[in-house]
Amino acid sequence: MIERVKIENLRSHSSTEIEFREGINVLVGPNGAGKTTVLEAITLALFPRTFRSYDHMIREGERRAVVEVVFWGADGHKYKVRREFYRGGGQRNPRLYREEGDGWKVVASGRAEDVDREVMNALGGVDRDVFREAVYIRQGEIAKLVEATREERKRIVDRTLGLAEFKKAREQAHELLRVAEAKLETFRERVRDLKGSKKELKRVERELEELKREVKELEPEVEELKERLNELREAKREFERLEGELRLLENKIESLKGRRDDLRKLVEEGKEAERELQRLGDVPSKVRELENEEAELRRRIEELRNLLDDLRSLRNRLESAEEELEGVKRELEELKDEAGVDPERLVEFKDKIVEASERLRDLRREEELKRKLEKVSDELSELGDREETLQSEYEELQERLDEIQGELKEIRVKEKELLERIESLREAEGECPVCLRKLPRERAEKLLRDAEKELERLQGREEDLRKERRELKDRLESVRRELEGTKERMWRLRERREELERELEEIEELKEELADLSRELGVEEDRLPELRDLAVRAESLLRDLERRRGDVLRLEKELERTLDRCEKVIGRTPSGVEDVEEELRRLEEERDHVGQKLREAEGELERYHNLEEKVKRAREARKELKRIERDLEDAKGRLEQVERNLEGLRERYGSEDRLEEELESVEKKYERVRDKLSEVKGRLNGMEKRREELKKQVRKYREAKERKERLERVVEVLSLCKEVFRYSRDVAREKVLPAVEREASKILQDLSDRYGSLRIEDDGAVIRVSVPGGHFIEADRMSGGEKIIIGLALRLALAMVGSSFAPFIMLDEPTVHLDAEHRERLAQALRELDLGKGRVRQAIVVTHDEELEDAADELWRIENRAGESRVERYSG
């Protein structure tokens, strides 16, 4: 049973301690509050998983996380396991303690494997797999037992009920029996073999003498054949090498002759090409002259075309500009008639007219400005009162903050004195640390408790003062900001009041200016807005008039400059656009004539280049021809040498066929004699080894016989153990499975009216549930929600009946996928569970559904505040 869990810097938990009771303990809170982390902390303490890094579990900004769990073991002792997980460093300093008297004794520490093993022993043999399959039912895995395959389901049931141990023991006995029987049969055969060892030993020694004589005769013959074989093989390789070289030389000579003929042909073609080049003359120079002439004509044509386009464009633009100039003049006449004033005079007074029109709106704002001025004055008065109030509160808060700071200093001095006194009392051995008189143990303990109690009171007071100081600082900062904001607002309002007063003075001046302007223009004041638009329009038209006149003059000058540029191209000043067009046609005809002559010359140029290439190839062919003739002479000389070497081999060994026949004959004889020698030596070595083995076997005969008799007795005992384990498992299953069926059926009926009873068949491989109508169906054929209900009932029943369980279970969000009715039924079922009756004495349930609160013997609420999990106890 879990008694207490402490968490430091694990996920969202900064510092959390929870004490659990026997019965149902419920941790309730919204999603993301950190409920499941409590179950993860228990799992990390008891059976930690091995990660490459635990950084993802350590709280952000912290160096390490610590989990500590106090639990009751299967032996009735209380244990405490503590583990530390470091960022980037894995698990360190794991320790397991057992309570003894008033203190804790270390059971295991240092190596994580040692601590894991002792934790498993303390829980009555529950290992990591059983814990994760049965004790800790994780979110979304309630239906795992129902949805598993038959073999997997049977394996889980056996492990959770302790039946797997019988199977494991029987399998071990079976394996030992198999090994023992194999060894027994081996020794039986050995005993039988050893009986004839003496007779076989004499026979082997006779055969050894015969084999040694035979080896002595065969070894000289093998050496003689080996030497002759090497000589013949070398001769064959030389035959093959020389014949291969001969063929290569003959092919090379033929190839060189063919290449020599080709090169001579190229040389003759080069001579003919040189004569043809002399006849053609300097064709490239002729082509370059025609290309330059054509390029110059193209340049002049392109330039003249561009000038012609410019002339046409300028003529069109000049006509458009003259039409636009006349249009602007007409608009100015119309504006003069509409305004009754010359446009030039309107433009002269435009700025005054516009300003007067704009400021006429200010006259209408006079009353509005007076109201705003009155409102600003009233607000300034109110803010002055608020400033005095805030200043007074700020001074009072600062005074209280100074008082708290002084009291905190006094408390820290007292705490230091108390800590020194406590340390002295703990180190003192029967005498007062102050007066050094003899101090009774009871008196010393009372003084120590009083000092610790006073220290605890001071620490509590210090925490209260620190909390009040934080609140005062927050309020002081809030008042300071509001006071600064008030002063800033008053300064802005004073500026606004001065601005409004200036605007009212300007309005009085404006009235006088408008009257003067109306008299000067000879119009009424109410016509000023109308004249403003006309003045703006008159100014725009006058500017447009000047711009149009400038455009006409500019286009006329540009047209003259373009005609001057045409003179540079055609050599005279053209009379107009038509004259330029006629000159352009003449240049294009001349360009076409030159182009025709160029194409004819380019045809001759291509033939000229081909002839040059032939001359070049002929020069290269002359050089290569000399090299080919030298190579040909060398190849003929080497060919004669190879033929002489081949003739010498034939005189010594005859023809190549005769050499091949002799080589084949010698190889066969050599292999035959060598194989026979190897066989004899192999037999000889085998016989010698066999002789040594037989000598050892004779000595071991009695020992083998004794071991055979002992193994016969062991086989008899193991056969009996195997049957005992099988029978014990069957008896245990017949006893335990009906109890699981009864408990699961009861819980299932509490969870839903739809179901009757639950059956476990085929030793746990098949789960059947009765439905309305009285018939049973397999649980794995039901819907997802039904599987969850059945899986939950079966898990709880296994926990209550199982013999290999720790005396507690943990449920993580068991209401997921359950509707409201089934959540209420689950709560009712948990309330009615008699946890003290079976081995399961405690259930720890994590949920976000408040329906399970009524089922709790102990209720804890977890919330996440500003990224940190906070735990509050609500019952107990």
Curated annotation (Swiss-Prot):
Coiled coil regions in record: 188-528, 575-710
Sequence ranges assigned to domain Zinc-hook in this UniProt record: 387-484
Cofactor annotation: Zn(2+)
Record's cofactor remark: Binds 1 zinc ion per homodimer.
Classification via InterPro entries: AAA+_ATPase, ATPase_AAA_core, P-loop_NTPase, Rad50/SbcC_AAA, Rad50_ATPase_archaeal, Zn_hook_RAD50
Domain of life the protein comes from: Archaea
Record family assignment: Belongs to the SMC family. RAD50 subfamily.
Domain remark text: The two conserved Cys that bind zinc constitute the zinc-hook, which separates the large intramolecular coiled coil regions. The 2 Cys residues coordinate one molecule of zinc with the help of the 2 Cys residues of the zinc-hook of another Rad50 molecule, thereby forming a V-shaped homodimer.
Protein known as: DNA double-strand break repair Rad50 ATPase
Gene assigned in the entry: rad50
